[in-house]
Amino acid sequence: MIKVLPVKFIIYRIEQIGICGGDIMLENIPSQSIMTELLGQSLYEVWQALCSSIDEKYDMEQLWNTGGKNWTYEYKYRRGGKTLCSLYAKSNCIGFMIIFGKDERTKFEAIRNTLSTVVCRQYDEAKIYRDGKWVMFEPANTADFDNYMKLLAIKRKPNRK
């Protein structure tokens, strides 16, 4: 016999066990001291600056997840079930990923000449999967943040003035 469960119960169980879109959400969000220890002081400041730049232009839901097999943590910016970008952290390294769909790749080509050669090279070297081109940047400073904001604007118009 199949037992039908109320939707409220199912949502509660999903939240309780921490599954969100296939990701494993963290029960304990890493503290500033944990992140500083993991990244080092200078990279933690870069992480904070990148988050501030995104937060300044976008009102998004932020989700902490495990970082999978290659990273310690993932910090995802989402709205309406769609991911804008994800930040990743592991020992002395930051990752910043944007996934470009087919239409977004066309928009990238339209602004390519306004972007740095470093950003364009990283884009060109990224693999294309069935759901898009997965571009991973590893910022060590804030030099390319203006370029990153242009890339995010391809994905979604800023919703903060």
Walk through the language-model features, giving the residues of each.
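Charge-dense, helix-prone N-terminal extensions
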Residues: 2-161
